[in-house]
Amino acid sequence: MRSNRILLLAALLMGCAARVPEVAIGPLADGLDAFLAAHVPADENIRADPVARTETASYHVVQVRDRETPHRHAAHDLTVFVLRGRGALVLGHTRIPLRAGDAVLIPRGAAHWFVNEGRRRAVALAVFTPPLDAADAVPAGEFD
């Protein structure tokens, strides 16, 4: 009877474990761990790697060690899917806590920045619409 309770408790705890988001896009189809192992940021605070593109969007894996500086994208809407880690996105005057599995839409022109609150790099899939062809980050004041 006691062993049945232990098995039931173990099964319940496994069901409560956080699920790691999976991404089946381009080079990520073989697994995020393999991709990250091949794309380790040396001493970079932020590393962004393009992973796919369509006529209407471009897809990038972004790794953040510490934080972004406040900025805006003049010509792109941005959708961010957090794949690993946790942190806070400051969007305008609003602080949005984010962790793996969360998503957020950042409209073009909106001042924003991400602050990593974990011990390891935060990793996200960033989707730019229209596709990102050139640098589009324009510095923005903290409460711009």
Regions of interest found by a model, annotated:
Residues C16-V61, P139-D144:
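A short, N-terminal "cap"/entry segment at the start of jelly-roll beta-barrel domains
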Residues T94-R108:
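Short acidic-glycine-tyrosine-enriched beta hairpin
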Residues V64, A74-L89, V127:
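Short, conserved beta-strand element in jelly-roll/cupin
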Residues L7-G15:
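Bacterial N-terminal signal peptides
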Residues S58, R86-A88, R95, A111, ...:
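Structural motif
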Residues M1-L7:
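Bacterial N-terminal signal peptides that target proteins for export
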